[in-house]
Amino acid sequence: MPGCLIKCSNVYVDNTGREIVSPMEYETICLLGTNCGLEDPDDVARMNEIANDLGVDSIELGATIAVLMDAGKGDFGDVAFMKEVTSEMMAGSENGKFYATGTARVGEALNFKRVPVIKKQAISAYDPRLIEVTGISMMLTAQGADHTVGNAATFKCDDKNVEELVAESLRMQINAAVADSFGLCVFGRSVTDENLELIANAINDAFDAGVTPDFIRNIGVETLRLEAAFNNAAGFGEDDDELPAFFLEEPLPPTGKMARLYSREVNAAMQNLMEAQSL
């Protein structure tokens, strides 16, 4: 984008300099790459290109293929199998239509239990056994397992209780809702999250609007309320916020950590926090 100082995008080329895909992003590298056992970044780029041509989400596609592999339908690291799956999807075959239903429904149909989804949406690169604030955000958000609603990948969780983790998740979710509402750069949020006055001043200078930092923060709070109300009206409940059981039962190498986050406890902590803050 002209004038952008961060320049987060990239162009991935082959050994002749021909563009394969642009951009190749972190989540795609994880879910379509290491998650599926790929070691050659060129293979990841070509799978990314296929996902783009299909118009499917690379996170969901990578998680779906990995579940198929984990269930014994293919071998980890087998890029030919991955291309076979996407070829079936592109052809619209019965298998392809099945694969296109996504991670949750493929796992259910195979009666497979290690399916990393929340509200039937695939979890991205952030394992809730280790990155707990992001795990809470993905549990509570109306948007399914969406890491962008309140990601705190570097937050030190080990010495925090659930209430403290929920408090950080709420703070991040409000900031993310503000950024999404105003179209603020996710990488610039290390500045804007901590300085709502800067945003208010910029808006006021441009539009003579007279908004305050509290007004901007309240937009984030109201966005979260509206999203939650929508999901409640659609029939979602507390049980839909649970992590998949294997996160609670299987230790994550090499740390050996298991998830300690349960929907009832997390929801109660969030409710208490919002009441205490009069939100």
Roles of regions detected by a PLM:
Residues 1-279:
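Extended C-terminal regions of large enzymes
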